[in-house]
Amino acid sequence: MKLLLCLGLTLVCIHAEEATSKGQNLNVEKINGEWFSILLASDKREKIEEHGSMRVFVEHIHVLENSLAFKFHTVIDGECSEIFLVADKTEKAGEYSVMYDGFNTFTILKTDYDNYIMFHLINEKDGKTFQLMELYGRKADLNSDIKEKFVKLCEEHGIIKENIIDLTKTNRCLKARE
């Protein structure tokens, strides 16, 4: 009986393991679908503040053969506008690149597929770089444990807590979603 219990707990732990794009266990197909922007962080805060070029709100990720297609919304002159971007796989395992306000490379830091996904992005433009981190959820908000995990990851990447914006308290263009 103890052996069965141990086996069952082991299987549960394996199933609950988080995936990362740098790890062997990421199944990119599982990130396909609807997402909501929850938290946004950057070491260059003005990029993610209201009217910042990187203040975009995800609606959908579509997994293609060698790329990821994103549907975003952004607020321009008080109106919600759609943005479509396609990020291509790079030669580095688990890394994607896309042109948007400069050249961006990003990886998936963590995901459990069913609730959340965390991205880390490096933007290069005119010889300058900054980093951006994003937390998306399958629902319009996430529990505080996941948010705290994201804050800790941001701090590990040198992004201070004051540069993390809770987008659940802002206009995320939810009414513009189809």
Swiss-Prot record:
**Chief location:** secreted
- Which superkingdom? Eukaryota
Keywords on this record? Disulfide bond, Pheromone-binding, Secreted, Signal, Transport
The residues the entry assigns to the signal sequence are 1-16
GO BP annotations, alphabetical order: aerobic respiration; cellular response to lipid; energy reserve metabolic process; glucose homeostasis; heat generation; locomotor rhythm; mitochondrion organization; negative regulation of DNA-templated transcription
Location within or outside the cell: Secreted
Tell me which tissues or organs this protein is expressed in: Expressed in lacrimal gland, parotid gland, sublingual gland, nasal mucus, and vomeronasal organ.
| One GO CC term, this protein | nucleus
- Report if keyword Hydrolase is assigned: no
Query: Cross-referenced PROSITE patterns, in alphabetical order?
Result: LIPOCALIN (PS00213)
Disulfide bridge map: 80-173
State whether keyword Transmembrane applies: no
**GO function term, MF aspect, one:** small molecule binding
The record's comment on protein family reads: Belongs to the calycin superfamily. Lipocalin family.
Function according to Swiss-Prot or TrEMBL: Binds pheromones, likely to displace pheromones complexed to urinary MUPs and transport them to the vomeronasal organ (VNO) where they associate with their neuronal receptor(s). MUP4 is highly specific for the male mouse pheromone 2-sec-butyl-4,5-dihydrothiazole (SBT).
Q: What's the protein called, per UniProt?
A: Major urinary protein 4
The record lists the organism as Mus musculus (Mouse)
Gene from which the chain derives = Mup4
